Amino acid sequence: MIECTWIADKLFRAVRAIIDKYKSRYYWSPIEPLRSNGSVKNIHEFPATWKIDEEQKCLCGNICGEESFVQSLKLFAITPQGRYPIYLPNHGNEQAESIFSAKGIEFTRQSEYMAAAIMKNYSEWIEQLYSIAKRKNRLYIELKVKGRPDTLKVEIISPSA
């Protein structure tokens, strides 16, 4: 009897450890990956831009191709729609400020809107969008771009972190 209690206690601790590990994670994925409707350009042709040093908060040189695309996607994800007139009026997304704190079904809803906004603004560069995940103060967007053999996983840190 004591051995059964000991095994049950060990099992309970293991399950609790797994639950604690995934407690602050949220994940959204469509039934079918979101696909671009038109032709997709090679990611290496993405326009050049200034490189933003995220740690020093300054511009430092130029970047192009995949690196430029990733930086652009990160800025799009954290920029509230219409906040900065230097960009197009629809640049950014409505969930930029709230998705990092959204939980449960609200995270699912906001992820769907963000995925639609990403596909709308980057449809000429993204072949498929697979998922959006959140862990603590970070978003992880997994997508497929032309010119890269594997999927691209973009990590986006909350601006308030």
Residue ranges of model-derived segments:
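Immediate N-terminus of the mature polypeptide
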Residues: 1-106, 137-142, 146-161
